[in-house]
Amino acid sequence: QYCPLQADCIACQNDLTADLPVPKPRKTLPVRETVHLILLDQERILLKKRPASGIWGGLWCFPEMSVDQDSIDYCEKNLHVRVTKLARLPHLQHTFTHFKLIIQPHLLQSIMHQPVCEEKCEENSYLWLTIEQAMQQAIPVPVRKLLSMAYPYFQYHIHE
């Protein structure tokens, strides 16, 4: 291809046009880790509406806790639901502009058939939904991926 600056171009004279300009090295993004709690109760899962501001503002997500907390204790103390662990699903990484998020999904089964959270959680901030209903909600892509990952477990446990 012809370039009007070719005669004065050092890169062209030294056959370096494919190598120049050298891109700046990418900035290393900080990494944050979190645990998403995928709670199953019969044919439903629990979703929580996120605050309007911040990441995924106003979208529906799984209840979330820090990686150093125990999921069974967290569910009892914060969600008022007694659970048993089913599985830890593979980690999911999602990259935002300013950081990488590593999600550790914990799949949990409600021990009670009528979770107390329906009565004691903040009004309109939690919903028990079927996976089909959840997929119709405003949910971020990582939550959609986690729902797909959990689906085989979900099918198995409602037909036990």
Regions found by a protein language model. Name each.
Residues Q1-E160:
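Intrinsically disordered, low-complexity, charged terminal extensions of DNA damage-control enzymes
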